[in-house]
Amino acid sequence: MGKKNTLKNFWVRLESASSTVTGSLIYLKPNFPNGKKEPELVFDCGTFLDSENKKYNEDFPCKPANIYAVFITHEHVDHMGRLAGFYNQGYKGKVFASEYAVQVIKSEAIKNFFFTMKNNEEPKHEEKDAISLINGCVPIKIGEIINIDDNVEMVAYNNAHTKGAVMYLITFKYEEHKIRILITGDYKKRSILGKSYFPSSKKYKGKITIVTEATNGTKKKPVAHFKKDLEKSLYEGKSILCSSAGSERYEDILYAIKTMQEAGKISSDIPIYLEVKNAFDLSKLNLNVLPFNFNLVNNSNVRKIALYDKRQKIIVVANYGAFTYYFPNVISKSNWGIFFVNHMYKGSLAERLMTPRGTIIKYCGKEYKKEATAYHTEEFSAHYYIDEFKELIEGFLDINAVFLGHGESESKKELQEEAQKRNGLNVQILKRGEAFKIFEDKIRHSS
């Protein structure tokens, strides 16, 4: 009887701040039978980017002052963009992330604050909050156990989603009982960056609850056609603007171009320009995938050269700010091809450009006549497709439940139904304002 009562009062409350693709934040609050106050934890603290949910950017499902630590899965703004605002509302703790993610977070903290002030926008935080964030960042090592206290430990594992991405396995312990929660963040099994730790070569035996994404829903991996489209466009004499802004990695694009050069599909005389967000993005790994005739756009003068160089060229941009500079200058020119490798949402610019030439396109408050040829592919998606989701799930022998976040409602619903039908899993959809209690061997809704 004593053991049953103990388990009844041993649970972890889980709540998501988001019902959509952006604004990722997972809040965990443990409850132990002995009544001991245990650390409240937050995983990711991302910005809402869509107009419908931007109003929630100052709202959190927890009191920041009560949070013991924040753990970031990767450096994309929809996973870390509200960190300074979290400090503004009372957070005093540390922010743990991979060494690379820490570099990006620090770089963005002050820059974003001054960008907001420069554009006369209402800041969501003060300069002191950005400074607190910079000094609060702590790099973590892959595979190293972090003992948060005697009852809670955490390990970060490699995640192939993007550079510096990790997934976290958190274990809450009480006597011989354990509640294990795996938070993947955005997930990719394998990429040019390497392979994710899970699924591993041996199936994981312990009872586990998985919190993961559902960006692509039940989509199968698309047929690769980027190289074919690029070769055709270049053969027609077009210059190329390729947007890898968002979660799609520019390394994949550059490596595809490099392999095409090596195969004689692209002349090495064609200059390749790359504009990235941070100078330190050019790591040793990046250098290994760089094509011939490569030029880094690292200041306004080189940017002008990239645009006005009359030779046929390829420009790859890895951030939205750079894209807003190039796009208005090429959209109305028939000798340009515009490639999108992002996930194409309804109403997105990529979707609106999949229209005939001569269509009027509205962008940043202005109208442009579309004459350039637009292409789209999701073959470089940094998010898993259905087969990778199945492989992830099959890597665990005893799954308590699966929670789906980071996706549109339809995508999450489709994946939920597929997983329940084929795997017999308890699959729940994370929604803003809803919470769950995770027990050792079950889950239930929480008020």
Q: Could you tell me what each predicted segment is?
A:
Residues G2-F71, H76-M80, G85-D252, K258-K265:
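His/Asp/Glu-rich metal-coordinating catalytic cores
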Residues Y68, K207-I208, K313-I314, W336, ...:
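Conserved acidic residues
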Residues N135-G143, F294-V302, I429-L430:
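Short acidic-hydrophobic, aromatic-tinged amphipathic segments that line or gate anion-handling sites
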Residues I148-Y157, K284-F292, F389-L392, F439-S447:
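Short, surface-exposed amphipathic charged segments that create phosphate/polyanion-binding patches used
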Residues R190-L274, I360-L425:
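Cap/insert and terminal regions of metallo-dependent hydrolase folds
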Residues K219-V223, N295-A306, V316-F323, P356-T359, ...:
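A general structural motif
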Residues K227-L349, G405:
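Hard-cation-handling environments
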Residues S332-A372:
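Redox- and metal-dependent alpha/beta enzyme cores, enriched for Fe-S-associated oxidoreductases
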